C-alpha cells in the first residue's frame, strides 16, 4: 500500500472506512498517529503498519486534525458482511507501542 503523508498529498487524502455488521474503522498508517498527535482508545486496532481507528471518537480526532491542516478527506467504503478480520488484530493498549 503506497501511502503518503498528507503534506505530500497536495491537500487531499483518501482513506478507507472498513465496516462490518457491527462497527467500523478508518485505516491510517501508524506513523500518522504520532505525526497528527492522535490518542486512539482501546477500541482501535493495529496490524503491521496500519492503525484502524474506531469510527466514533477516534476517527473524529483524525478528521479534526486533518481539517486543522486544511487537508480534504475522501472516504472509500469497504463493507464486510459478518465480522471483519480487524476484530482479530491487536487492540491499541498504549500508543507508545505503535
Regions found by a protein language model. Give the residues of each.
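N-terminal, charge-rich interaction modules
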Residues: 1-12
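Generic preference for well-ordered secondary structure
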Residues: 10, 46-47, 73
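Cysteine-centric segments in proteins
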Residues: 14-16
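Short, compact, well-ordered microdomains
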Residues: 52-98
Amino acid at each position: 500500500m503506497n501511502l503518503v503523508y498528507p503534506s505530500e498529498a497536495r491537500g487531499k487524502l483518501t482513506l478507507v472506512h472498513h465496516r462490518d455488521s457491527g462497527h467500523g474503522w478508518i485505516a491510517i498508517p501508524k506513523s500518522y498517529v504520532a505525526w497528527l498527535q492522535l490518542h486512539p482508545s482501546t477500541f482501535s486496532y493495529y496490524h503491521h503498519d496500519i492503525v484502524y481507528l474506531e469510527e466514533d471518537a477516534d476517527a473524529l480526532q483524525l478528521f479534526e486534525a486533518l481539517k486543522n491542516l486544511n487537508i480534504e478527506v475522501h472516504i472509500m467504503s469497504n463493507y464486510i458482511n459478518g465480522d471483519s478480520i480487524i476484530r482479530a488484530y491487536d487492540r491499541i493498549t498504549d500508543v507508545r507501542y505503535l
